[in-house]
């Protein structure tokens, strides 16, 4: 089974995270940030991943450190769980509608970290979650996992719906990218490595 568990502890946060790429029954998220818990749960369910997150952070300051560090640890776990990247599709993309909003995510498990984020999030806060942290989360995951990730809100009016569409699309795109493909020999690259 492709899986990884890691702990990251700093003076600002303590993150314990486990990711299972090939199992989807065990999802438990506790970050202390309700909206973020909801988004991570949606990511795991729509990606069909097992994901357990326990996070303690300096949320009395704000949620920035917790959200970013969860992204870092998720990226690290993804990188470790993928092992040698043999026989995976490598690429994945998904459009996801959420009522009036439409989100799009494209992923390349390339060994090169890059993140492009486009989306106008007009409501600055949802509960205890600063909506600008959506971009910080995706950047942290892409950098730590060494993947290329494009996330875009094509249109919409409700900020909650826009972010929800992105997290669901992230799960679906990542599922496609990490899926094993019997038609691929070795890694999906003319270089012979990723």
From Swiss-Prot:
Alphabetically ordered keywords of this record: Amino-acid biosynthesis, Cytoplasm, Histidine biosynthesis, Lyase
Catalytic activity line of the entry: D-erythro-1-(imidazol-4-yl)glycerol 3-phosphate = 3-(imidazol-4-yl)-2-oxopropyl phosphate + H2O
Example of a GO cellular component annotation carried by this entry: cytoplasm
Tagged with keyword Amino-acid biosynthesis: yes
Domain of life of the organism encoding this protein: Bacteria
Pfam families linked: IGPD
Location within or outside the cell: Cytoplasm
GO biological process: L-histidine biosynthetic process
EC number: 4.2.1.19
GO molecular function annotations of the record: imidazoleglycerol-phosphate dehydratase activity
Enzyme class (EC, first level): lyase
InterPro entries cross-referenced by the UniProt entry: IGPD_sf, ImidazoleglycerolP_deHydtase, ImidazoleglycerP_deHydtase_CS, Ribosomal_Su5_D2-typ_SF
Family the entry assigns: Belongs to the imidazoleglycerol-phosphate dehydratase family.
Name this protein carries in UniProt: Imidazoleglycerol-phosphate dehydratase
Species of provenance: Bacillus cereus (strain G9842)
């Amino acid at each position: 089974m492709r899986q990884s568990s890691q702990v990251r502890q700093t003076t600002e946060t303590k993150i314990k995270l486990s990711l299972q790429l090939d199992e989807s029954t065990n999802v438990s998220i506790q970050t202390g940030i309700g909206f973020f818990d909801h988004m991570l749960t949606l990511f795991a369910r729509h990606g069909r991943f097992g994901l357990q997150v326990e996070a303690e952070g300096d949320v009395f300051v704000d949620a920035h450190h917790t959200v970013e560090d969860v992204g870092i640890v998720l990226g690290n776990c993804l990188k470790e769980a993928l092992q040698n990247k043999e026989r995976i599709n490598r690429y994945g993309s998904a459009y996801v509608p959420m009522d009036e909003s439409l989100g799009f995510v494209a992923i390349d498990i390339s060994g090169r970290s890059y993140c492009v984020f486009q989306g106008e999030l007009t409501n600055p806060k949802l509960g205890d979650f600063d909506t600008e942290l959506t971009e910080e989360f995706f950047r942290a995951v892409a950098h730590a996992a060494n993947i290329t990730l494009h996330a875009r809100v094509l249109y919409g009016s409700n900020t909650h719906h826009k972010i929800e569409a992105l997290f669901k699309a992230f799960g679906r795109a990542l599922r496609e990218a990490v899926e094993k493909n019997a038609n691929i020999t070795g890694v999906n690259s003319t270089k012979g490595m990723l």
